[in-house]
């Protein structure tokens, strides 16, 4: 399959998983080797790898590593022997539903009692990885079709190759729109506190030769007020059955600003991110990370000594603020009734 992106976040080596350490970007390109499920779970928790699809893919490979270790320790009852490793993977990040989807899919392989379990598990993990890339390219096409030539777009966080199996979700739409119709401007907000927009999205777009302008998150409404943005395009970590969408903190504020200024708001997510067992956004668990991530920037404290911090890293955008949900199976523009459910089950 031809590539239109120059970056990959995961590389399966057959006996271990290599992860591009996204905490070190863009200053350093460092790969971390994961030789066990524990290594993989720690990398997910510590945000070496991030982005819902990439987390799911990494977890799938983590199951392969868990199975290999369990078979070496207790070949007669290896499925039971890997239970602790699977629990550790499952608890690594609470909001990204792709993690649980991938682990459930790998568990189905274990439960099927294949003749060659390791080969079957590895094939399943590779399929999850490859299917994600295929889905991203399809979403790129579907989303780009909705964006007129010469439009200005703004994206939030990082939803590109670094967050997925390749190409990206929201950033995949931007890649497709740029190469197909052309865009007047591509803006990325910095995305505090981990600066995924400044560090990762800008890095990906520059590497691909797509001009990008960085803005502070608080500048987004002014950008809309001045008519420079026609679409805000974001990814998702979990989409509820009613269309409510959990994504990186700050997404909800962008959606409210879009509604105030008549700017279109697009969510781009593979079907693996849709949780039909979750009826609405109020049921989505919101991860809160250590306050130090707000109080410090790298190794330097930026907040006054004695100040505390509240650090939720996701918020929920109600479906009524979303103009379109793009998946590899099609698009949803009407979230009433069975809109999302019909797309997935149809």
From Swiss-Prot:
Gene3D superfamilies for the chain: translation initiation factor eif-2b, domain 1 (1.20.120.420), Translation initiation factor eif-2b, domain 2 (3.40.50.10470)
Enzyme class: isomerase
InterPro entries, per database record: IF-2B-related, IF-M1Pi, IF_2B-like_C, Initiation_fac_2B_a/b/d, M1Pi_N, NagB/RpiA_transferase-like
Residue numbers binding substrate: 50-52, 93, 196, 247-248
Pathway membership: Amino-acid biosynthesis; L-methionine biosynthesis via salvage pathway; L-methionine from S-methyl-5-thio-alpha-D-ribose 1-phosphate: step 1/6
Matches recorded under SUPFAM superfamilies: NagB/RpiA/CoA transferase-like
Reaction catalysis annotation: 5-(methylsulfanyl)-alpha-D-ribose 1-phosphate = 5-(methylsulfanyl)-D-ribulose 1-phosphate
Site feature (Transition state stabilizer) residues: 157
UniProt keyword Amino-acid biosynthesis, yes or no: yes
Family: Belongs to the eIF-2B alpha/beta/delta subunits family. MtnA subfamily.
Biological role: Catalyzes the interconversion of methylthioribose-1-phosphate (MTR-1-P) into methylthioribulose-1-phosphate (MTRu-1-P).
Name of the molecule in the record: Methylthioribose-1-phosphate isomerase
Taxon lineage: Bacteria, Pseudomonadati, Pseudomonadota, Gammaproteobacteria, Chromatiales
Gene (name only): mtnA
């Amino acid at each position: 399959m031809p590539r239109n992106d120059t970056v990959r976040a995961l590389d399966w080596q057959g006996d271990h998983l290599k992860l591009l350490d996204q905490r070190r970007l863009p200053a350093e390109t460092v790969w971390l080797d994961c030789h066990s499920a524990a290594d993989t779970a720690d990398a997910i928790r510590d945000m070496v790898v991030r982005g819902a699809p990439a987390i799911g893919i990494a977890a799938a490979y983590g199951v392969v590593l868990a199975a290999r270790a369990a078979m070496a320790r207790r070949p007669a009852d290896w499925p039971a022997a890997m239970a602790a490793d699977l629990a550790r993977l499952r608890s690594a990040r609470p909001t990204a539903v792709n993690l649980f989807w991938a682990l459930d899919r790998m568990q189905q392989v274990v439960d099927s009692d294949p003749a060659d379990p390791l080969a079957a598990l590895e094939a399943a993990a590779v399929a999850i990885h490859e299917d994600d890339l295929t889905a991203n390219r399809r979403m790129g096409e579907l989303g780009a079709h909705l964006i007129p030539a010469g439009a200005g777009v703004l994206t939030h966080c990082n939803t590109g190759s670094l967050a997925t199996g390749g190409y990206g979700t929201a950033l995949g739409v931007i890649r497709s729109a740029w190469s197909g119709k052309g865009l007047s401007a591509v803006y990325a907000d910095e995305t505090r506190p981990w600066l995924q927009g400044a560090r990762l999205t800008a890095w990906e777009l520059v590497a691909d030769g797509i001009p990008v302008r960085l803005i502070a998150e608080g500048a987004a409404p002014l950008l809309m007020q001045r008519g420079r943005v026609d679409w805000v395009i974001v990814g998702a970590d979990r989409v509820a059955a009613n269309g409510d969408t959990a994504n990186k903190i700050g997404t909800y504020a962008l959606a409210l600003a879009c509604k105030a200024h008549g700017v279109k708001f697009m969510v781009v997510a593979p079907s693996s991110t849709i949780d039909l067992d979750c009826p609405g956004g109020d049921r989505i668990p919101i991860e809160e990370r250590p306050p130090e991530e707000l109080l410090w920037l790298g190794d330097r404290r930026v907040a006054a000594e004695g100040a505390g911090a509240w650090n939720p890293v996701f918020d929920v955008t109600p479906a009524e603020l979303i103009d379109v949900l793009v998946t590899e199976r099609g698009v949803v523009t009407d979230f009433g009734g069975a809109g999302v459910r019909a797309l997935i089950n149809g």
